[in-house]
UniProtKB/Swiss-Prot annotation:
<dbReference type="InterPro" id="IPR014721">
    <property type="entry name" value="Ribsml_uS5_D2-typ_fold_subgr"/>
</dbReference>
<keyword id="KW-0689">Ribosomal protein</keyword>
<dbReference type="GO" id="GO:0003723">
    <property type="term" value="F:RNA binding"/>
</dbReference>
<dbReference type="InterPro" id="IPR000754">
    <property type="entry name" value="Ribosomal_uS9"/>
</dbReference>
<dbReference type="GO" id="GO:0022627">
    <property type="term" value="C:cytosolic small ribosomal subunit"/>
</dbReference>
<dbReference type="Pfam" id="PF00380">
    <property type="entry name" value="Ribosomal_S9"/>
</dbReference>
<comment type="similarity">
    <text>Belongs to the universal ribosomal protein uS9 family.</text>
</comment>
<keyword id="KW-0687">Ribonucleoprotein</keyword>
<dbReference type="InterPro" id="IPR020574">
    <property type="entry name" value="Ribosomal_uS9_CS"/>
</dbReference>
<dbReference type="InterPro" id="IPR023035">
    <property type="entry name" value="Ribosomal_uS9_bac/plastid"/>
</dbReference>
<protein>
    <recommendedName>
        <fullName>Small ribosomal subunit protein uS9</fullName>
    </recommendedName>
</protein>
<dbReference type="GO" id="GO:0006412">
    <property type="term" value="P:translation"/>
</dbReference>
<dbReference type="GO" id="GO:0003735">
    <property type="term" value="F:structural constituent of ribosome"/>
</dbReference>
<dbReference type="InterPro" id="IPR020568">
    <property type="entry name" value="Ribosomal_Su5_D2-typ_SF"/>
</dbReference>
Length: 130
């Protein structure tokens, strides 16, 4: 790979993303596809761009990303986490701004398991008084 690149691993729910950043023109490639092609939802594209827009490096870095597992929202969150970690490796002075925005912390929320005797994780069967 290129000699002047930085790497970050991001995770969210059951998704895992590997992010490589290097100086360039702002091209974002996810699993060999453009950002706009990979994510149909505008919200997912916004989530991916958030850390770059915060530190104003949107058009100065090229991103090469591979992401596996989970759905659209989980993958977008994993990519955001990975980009954040790669940016901190690229320039440690960006850490306070990224931390203040809440991008550094790994979102530990997971799907709650279904319990025996219940319909879903918390949904109880309808109560019948008589």
């Amino acid at each position: 790979m290129a000699e002047n690149q930085n790497y970050g691993t991001g995770r969210r729910k059951s998704s895992s993303a590997r992010v490589f950043i290097k100086p360039g023109s702002g091209k974002i490639t996810i699993n060999q596809r453009e950002l706009d092609v990979y994510f149909g939802r505008e919200t997912a594209r916004m989530v991916v761009r958030q850390p770059l827009e915060l530190v104003e490096l949107t058009d100065k870095l090229d991103l090469y990303i591979t992401v596996k597992g989970g759905g659209i929202s989980g993958q977008a969150g994993a990519i955001r986490h990975g980009i954040t970690r790669a940016l901190m490796e690229y320039d440690e002075t960006l850490r306070p701004a990224l931390r203040a925005a809440g991008f550094v912390t790994r979102d530990a929320r997971r799907v709650e398991r279904k319990k025996v005797g219940l319909h879903k994780a918390r949904r109880r069967p309808q109560y019948s008084k008589r």
